Amino acid sequence: MPSLLLWTGLGNPEPGMALQRHNIGFMAVDAIAQRHGFTPWRNRFKGLTAEGTLAGRKIILLKPMTYMNASGESVQPATAFFKLPPEAVSAFHDELDLAPGKVRVKRGGGAAGHNGLRSMDRMLGTPEYWRVRLGIGHPGSKERVHGHVLGNFAKSDQEWLGPLLEAVADAAPLLAEGRAEDFMTRIALLTHRQ
């Protein structure tokens, strides 16, 4: 397990987009930074970075300010600067194919239509980084996907969204240790979602 990890939250930088489902990746890294006393966010690598330590490993949190479709243009210079292999990189992102509040971690795989992941794959030259898939649910039909991901979380979503972000922050040290299964289990226990 590398001693330095880059955790990227995927989202869009416009203030008016902050509460959209597509921005749950930003929300997750914000929760981690706040819970674990990371440094204040600062401008770097066409994004915002915050630094801290979890489980004895240095973590760089990154929020690309490039818009979702160009996320790789922020992630690539950060990985090059720190000389990071793909396995040291994780992308926290919204996942249509998981029920709201469910979390799955995997390494590699396809972009599944997610433009942020597609941009990272292209700019990093490999899909072999980690993905922390944060379930937002599927609207039911392909035609409604665009409006769903770019829509704000509904009031009813708050009952699972807040606890989920708290649980991700709470379990983050397990992820830093490379214990993806334990990270997922801890979140499921904390949110009562198996």
Swiss-Prot record:
Role according to the record: Hydrolyzes ribosome-free peptidyl-tRNAs (with 1 or more amino acids incorporated), which drop off the ribosome during protein synthesis, or as a result of ribosome stalling. Catalyzes the release of premature peptidyl moieties from peptidyl-tRNA molecules trapped in stalled 50S ribosomal subunits, and thus maintains levels of free tRNAs and 50S ribosomes.
Protein name as annotated: Peptidyl-tRNA hydrolase
Record text on subunit structure and interactions: Monomer.
GO MF annotation list: peptidyl-tRNA hydrolase activity; tRNA binding
Positions bound to tRNA: 67, 69, 115
One Pfam short name: Pept_tRNA_hydro
Cellular compartments annotated: Cytoplasm
Annotated EC: 3.1.1.29
HAMAP family: Pept_tRNA_hydro_bact
GO BP, sorted A to Z: protein quality control for misfolded or incompletely synthesized proteins; rescue of stalled ribosome
Sites annotated Stabilizes the basic form of H active site to accept a proton: 94
Site (Discriminates between blocked and unblocked aminoacyl-tRNA): 12
Domain of life (superkingdom): Bacteria
